[in-house]
UniProtKB/Swiss-Prot annotation:
A motif ('KMSKS' region) lies at residues 269-273. Disulfide bonds: none annotated. It comes from Encephalitozoon cuniculi (strain GB-M1) (Microsporidian parasite). Zn(2+) binds at C31, C211, H236, E240. One of its GO terms (molecular function) is ATP binding. It catalyses: tRNA(Cys) + L-cysteine + ATP = L-cysteinyl-tRNA(Cys) + AMP + diphosphate. Keywords: Aminoacyl-tRNA synthetase, ATP-binding, Ligase, Metal-binding, Nucleotide-binding, Protein biosynthesis, Zinc. This is Cysteine--tRNA ligase. Its EC number is 6.1.1.16. The keyword Protein biosynthesis applies.
Amino acid sequence: MDKTLKLYNSITRTIDIFTPRKGNEVKMYICGPTVYDSSHIGHARTYVMFDVIRRVLSDYLKYNVRFVMNITDIDDKIIARANETGASMEEVTRKYTEEFFEDMKTLNVRSPSFVTFVTSYVDKIVKFIEKLEANGLAYESRGSVYFDLNSYQQRYSYPLFKSKDGINSEGDENKDKRSPCDFVLWKRSKENEPRYESKWGHGRPGWHIECSVMSSDILGEDLDIHAGGVDLAFPHHENEIAQCQAYFMQEPWVKCFLHTGHLNISGLKMSKSLKNFTTIKEALKTISPRQLRVLFLHHQWNKDMNYEKEHLKFAETIEKKIFNFMSVAESMRKNALAFETLENADREVLRELGNVQEAVHAALLDNVDTPAVMKRIVEMINFTNARIKTISPSTVLVVKDYIKEITDVLGLSEEERQESPGEDLIAQLLSNFRESIREMARRKEPYSKFLEKCDWIRESIKDYGYIIEDNSEGSILRKK
């Protein structure tokens, strides 16, 4: 099978052929959250879509992926939140770290191979900065340490994801810098801020240095893939590249940089600073985790995406189509025979399946084109459904098993439990139905009464979003 994967590389601004540096091993790093608040659906999109890319690499293309994520648990925003709430920094970061991973589990995002916390890496961060200083690429000023961009540019290529003005102040005091574009590696501590010892005095790590140190500690001096949201491209990712190339004295540090596009609401980027964000938990009150993933899959991962109400309904419709088909197909398994005569309709469906398999494979290799994959999957379901009464159960199951293979790669779990407020009522309804049937059997009531009761349960369960369908193979339960 051709494994020539092409990915949009933010460094080259082109779709490049991806080949790991070392055999079958892929070293992949993603910037995790700064844990001072609840994650929003913009974050959800980033982590879900990189979960999909990771699954394509590991499950579909069979690469051995080492996937590292950091947690930023020292930051100005965390300090501000602790001061606002009266909680300690540890209480703030613990709360939102736990909430983040709960959200990721709900969204069926696989756990990283390794998770790193900044607070556990301060000593290594200090040593990393000391080497940059020794290499002549960092300098101390009034207890803080800055990256010397002018010195760096004389040796290495920079910038890569340049902003409009190229200035990276990040709120630092320019009077302490040699150049306004220099960025902080070590911040001197102010009163009532967390502080760690260093040869420059008490301070704490700057934002960018954290990821450089943690990624290289786990994955070594170079990466195959670095991933994150496009809002981190400048200055964060650009500065990461500069730090690592200066430290290891080689380039390129990252082979392929991947950035998800912005998630927009009413044409505006969703962000906490604009106060137009919807948390993941709030979003999941109106759409299931699987439906949210379906919605994301219908948009190319590296393009901007609009989040609109009508899109939620579309995702719900597509999700039900896929998993209702899987449910109906699975109900046929008991009647599928290993040796069946193929009719023309069976051959037609299997021929179309072959075309779809080729198209899906090509789409996955072409920058992980999930919209094209979803389109072909739905078309295959429609094609099969139109002939389902004239083809054998075995043919239906061949289609179903392939669709399950691909939906598994996309992270659409067939076993996802769809919780709803009516679940307890459904359980009570079925309990009452069972008790009624037992009582009717004890009274030896006529056969027609049992059929009436079966019709009653079929009508009653519709109120909770389920349909019981009878066919020649028996009865199946599916969602409306």
